[in-house]
Amino acid sequence: RDREPAARNYLSKAVNTENKLEICELDLLKDDGWDDAAQGCEYVIHVASPLVQKAPDDENEVIEPAKQGLIRALKSAIKNKVKRFVMTSSFSAVGYGHDRDVFDESHWTDPKKNIGAYNKSKAMAERAMWDHLESLPESDRIEAVAINPTLVVGPSLSDDMGTSNMFIQKMLEGSY
């Protein structure tokens, strides 16, 4: 699925993106294209993670693409010395197993608990990002941030509604 033309068209109506935005769709499980995609970028925003409607038979079908894709994007951002790497993580990475209303960088969801493949994937991918950065010499690190929204929704940019929007549609129809 090539969502780039629809996304570029939508965003260009909202803000001036001419020569300022590159949208890349890459395979989370393959090395091809990551370094080229980050070349010349000041910022890399990683928004991809598998979201499935039904629990997979093997949770690694969701966990591995999330972790591996995130690390591929991060390594390419580091190699290309971007100013900042932004990971769209999830409340799932920090919010389960705590009895509180406010969360900070010390709170983590325990992926060993029975919390579902998607929730595990977000916790494990974000932890992998921070662990990778911490493993590097200070001089090789880049600025990174993870955002942890509870839900990301918006207008569909193509005929493919996407899983998040499909959940909302099903709830509105009373079929979820």
Each predicted region: which residue ranges?
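Residues in the short beta-alpha loop(s) of Rossmann-like NAD(P)-binding domains
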Residues: R1-E4, F91
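NAD(P)H-binding glycine-rich loop region in Rossmannoid oxidoreductase-like domains
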Residues: R3-Q68
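Short aromatic-enriched loop/helix-cap "lid" or pocket-rim segments at secondary-structure transitions
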Residues: R8-Y10, G97-D101, S156-M161
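Short, conserved catalytic or adaptor-binding loops enriched in Gly and charged residues
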Residues: L11-E18, E134-P137, K170
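Conserved Rossmann-fold NAD(P)-dependent oxidoreductase catalytic core, especially the SDR/UDP-sugar
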Residues: H46, P50, A55-Y118
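Active-site Tyr-X1-5-Lys
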Residues: K113-A144
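NAD(P)-dependent short-chain dehydrogenase/reductase
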Residues: L136-Y176
